[in-house]
Amino acid sequence: MRPFHGTTVLCVRRDGKVVMASDGQVTLDKTVMKSTARKVRRLAEGAVLAGFAGATADAFQLFELFEKKLKEHARSLPRAAVELAKQWRTDRMLRRLEAMLVVADREHILVLSGAGDVIEPDPVPGGGVVAIGSGAPYAVAAARALLGHSALPARQVAEEAMKLAAEICIYTNANLTFEEL
């Protein structure tokens, strides 16, 4: 799978709050095609947050499949994620999808990849954090620093971390979208 350009999706958990944020930039090769895309959404009647990096059409297909898995497994996020990853890895058509997902509920934050990975990041002092996309390393570093050395709420940690990622990563802009639990 080739690296994805054109997005940063960040998920932060602190004090019982979960915030998922994304930038709005869509890049095709070396051209910015759109600056206000929504890459995060609510699933399972608002109980789950999901964000994507990669091909948009592929991500929407994966959102649909993931929502079905959530229904099949009584909204168990880890179980639904593992079942989607198994299907994604073994189905010939799904294997060609080029996207990554971050999914979260109040207890779990997971990253799903087309390689069949389901990763739950280690907790960090003050909460939990994960990001995908080209600006992920910058957003994670900033969020971890803020979680460990400030009392900012989850939403503000996500906002400041995404602003920093937008300043550094040329494939990430500052038109931010947030979803919260």
Curated annotation (Swiss-Prot):
Q: Which Pfam families match?
A: Proteasome
Classification via Gene3D superfamilies: Glutamine Phosphoribosylpyrophosphate, subunit 1, domain 1 (3.60.20.10)
One GO BP on record is: proteolysis involved in protein catabolic process
Keyword terms of this UniProt record: Allosteric enzyme, Cytoplasm, Hydrolase, Metal-binding, Protease, Sodium, Threonine protease
One GO CC term, this protein? HslUV protease complex
Assigned EC number: 3.4.25.2
Note the InterPro entries from the entry: ATP-dep_Prtase_HsIV_su, Ntn_hydrolases_N, Proteasome_sua/b, Proteasome_suB-type
List, alphabetically, the PROSITE patterns matched. Answer: PROTEASOME_BETA_2 (PS51476)
Task: Identify the enzyme class.
Answer: hydrolase
Subcellular localization: Cytoplasm
Q: Which domain of life is it from?
A: Bacteria
Q: What regulation of activity is recorded for this protein?
A: Allosterically activated by HslU binding.
Extract the GO molecular function terms from the UniProt entry.
metal ion binding; threonine-type endopeptidase activity
According to its UniProt record, which residues of this chain constitute the active site? 7
Q: Where are the transmembrane segments?
A: none
* Substrates-to-products reaction catalysed: ATP-dependent cleavage of peptide bonds with broad specificity
Q: Does the keyword Magnesium apply?
A: no
Q: What does this protein do?
A: Protease subunit of a proteasome-like degradation complex believed to be a general protein degrading machinery.
Q: Which family does it belong to?
A: Belongs to the peptidase T1B family. HslV subfamily.
What is the protein's name according to its record? ATP-dependent protease subunit HslV
What are the top taxonomic ranks of the organism?
Answer: Bacteria, Pseudomonadati, Myxococcota, Myxococcia, Myxococcales
